[in-house]
Amino acid sequence: MSVETERSSTESSAASGLDFEDTALTLRLPGSLAAAAAPDPDRKRSSPSSSDAADAADNSSPLAAAADAPPAPKARVVGWPPVRSFRKNALAAKFVKVAVDGAPYLRKVDLEAYSGYDQLLRALQDKFFSHFTIRKFADDERKLVDAVNGTEYVPTYEDKDGDWMLVGDVPWKMFVETCQRLRLMKSSEAVNLAPRAAQ
């Protein structure tokens, strides 16, 4: 039976045009010649200086020099790789985390989406609608007040230096550039945070 399998394997290899040497696993690159990949063990290596001189003589023609030159760098196509619009918008946005004293969760707010402090306060009221309402006081000041127990909350922010400041102390653009995160503190805890103008 083994004779029959050998015949069938040789017949199939003859039919496909491949013999054992073509399909054998070796350490040479596919398609390279077997004689070039397997040097004769009795043959001595040539010295590198003599082979360099022979290569230099062969490369004297301009066609050979052009073939050995590295390929020119490819020009980068404008707009490639494609960047999705939501990634572009995400890079342009300035998200900061908002923490509320007594709330076990944080929210994120995009400061670039608002044009002033009033819009930011309304957005904070919307984010934490179960907690706060905005009340106007006699001196035309708006404050966030807890709807359940009447506790006042003061919006504060951490700047790039790590200092906690009151929201509204600086112009809006400067606030957007320097704000790292927001915190709505109870007004009783925010006593030490005085406006810069008062200091």
Curated annotation (Swiss-Prot):
Keywords: Auxin signaling pathway, Nucleus, Repressor, Transcription, Transcription regulation. Aux/IAA proteins are short-lived transcriptional factors that function as repressors of early auxin response genes at low auxin concentrations. Highly expressed in flowers. Expressed at low levels in roots and shoots. Belongs to the Aux/IAA family. Its main location: nucleus. The keyword Cytoplasm does not apply. It comes from the Eukaryota. Signal peptide: none annotated. GO terms for biological process: auxin-activated signaling pathway; regulation of DNA-templated transcription; response to auxin. It is found in: Nucleus. Induction: By auxin. A motif (EAR-like (transcriptional repression)) lies at residues 25-29. PROSITE patterns: PB1. GO terms for cellular component: nucleus. Gene3D superfamilies: Phosphatidylinositol 3-kinase Catalytic Subunit, Chain A, domain 1. The gene is IAA1. The keyword Nucleus applies. Homodimers and heterodimers. This is Auxin-responsive protein IAA1. Residues 93-187 form the PB1 domain. Residues 47-69 have a biased composition (Low complexity). InterPro entries: AUX/IAA_dom (IPR033389), AUX_IAA (IPR003311), PB1-like (IPR053793). Residues 31-74 are annotated as: Disordered.
